[in-house]
């Protein structure tokens, strides 16, 4: 990775982040089973355009694990507390552009909805945008993988067998993943048990069939905020993608000032089309600056 991570103290824990360059902040927010590493081939396209910030969410990447974690750890509320405090610690407060993937969309949109005056714009890719009706809504077996991870066998297959990294992450990449990349994805979750808890907690919070109810409600509220905000938006569409379904497209059509680029990829197009994403993102950003 060409970027060196630094560490900040947040709520008594160490969080890792990349913080490079000067100017208005461009904040890259990752989701489940990944870290700031996922942006390694996209951020170079943004160099010279602003201050590039990419956090490792708490319990992920090189950020600390939570002490005494268990089934109720790494809930969205807890992740949000660390994310918000990290941005505050880094002095990210105005003219902010968010680049969000997966659950990074929830963390970023929540922050944006509470700091609308601070937002310059946001880009999103494969985020949790709407409540999906059922596991059967998903394509190509992805719903069945989610059903397995969220079922009674979830703790065993995720915490013991590292199912989310070995099966779900890899199932979201089209190319043959090289050993260097897989080693970095596996590294934060090498130890079986609670070290892998973030990957289980995240997947169990995906709103499917209205459950969990609190996440379903938050997802609806954040979509409503995006609908009401005139800030510039960029939809980075992965083709064929994995979690963006007809209901998501219908929702995105209601978001004003919303541009789109399409790149080749499944759930993690950053691994298949990083240069296409980077070039499209840079062109869009220059247009809103």
Q: What spans do the regions from the language model cover?
A:
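Active-site helix-initiating loop/hinge in glycosyltransferases
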Residues: 31, 272-273
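Flexible "cap/lid" subdomain of the alpha/beta-hydrolase fold that forms the substrate-access gate
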Residues: 1-3, 13-15, 53, 60-99, ...
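Histidine-centered active-site loop/cap adjacent to the catalytic His
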Residues: 277
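Conserved HGGG/HGGXW glycine-rich cap/lid loop of the alpha/beta-hydrolase fold
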Residues: 13-65, 86, 251
């Amino acid at each position: 990775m060409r970027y060196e991570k630094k560490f900040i103290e947040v709520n008594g824990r160490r969080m890792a982040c990349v913080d490079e360059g000067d100017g208005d902040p461009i904040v890259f927010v990752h989701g489940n089973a990944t870290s700031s590493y996922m942006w390694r081939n996209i951020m170079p396209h943004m160099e010279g355009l602003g201050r590039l910030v990419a956090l490792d969410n708490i319990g992920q990447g090189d950020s600390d694990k939570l002490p005494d974690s268990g089934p109720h750890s790494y809930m969205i509320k807890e992740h949000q507390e660390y994310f918000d405090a990290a941005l505050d610690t880094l002095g990210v407060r105005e003219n902010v552009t968010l680049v969000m993937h997966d659950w990074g969309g929830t963390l970023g949109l929540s922050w944006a909805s509470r700091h609308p005056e601070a937002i310059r714009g946001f880009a999103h890719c494969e985020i949790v945008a709407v409540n999906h009706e059922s596991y059967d809504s998903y394509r190509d077996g992805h719903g069945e993988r989610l059903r397995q991870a969220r079922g009674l066998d979830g703790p065993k297959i995720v915490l013991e067998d590292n199912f989310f990294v070995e099966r779900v992450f890899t199932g979201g990449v089209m190319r043959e993943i090289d050993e260097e990349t897989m080693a970095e994805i596996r590294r934060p979750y090498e130890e079986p048990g609670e070290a892998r808890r973030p990957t289980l907690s995240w997947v169990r919070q995906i709103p499917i069939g209205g459950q969990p109810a609190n996440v379903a409600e938050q997802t609806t509220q954040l979509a409503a905020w995006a609908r009401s905000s005139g800030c510039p938006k960029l939809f980075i569409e992965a083709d064929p993608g994995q979690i963006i379904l007809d209901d998501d497209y219908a929702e995105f059509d209601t978001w004003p000032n919303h541009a789109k680029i399409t790149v080749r990829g499944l759930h993690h197009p950053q691994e298949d089309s990083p240069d296409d994403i980077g070039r499209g993102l840079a062109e869009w950003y220059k247009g809103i600056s």
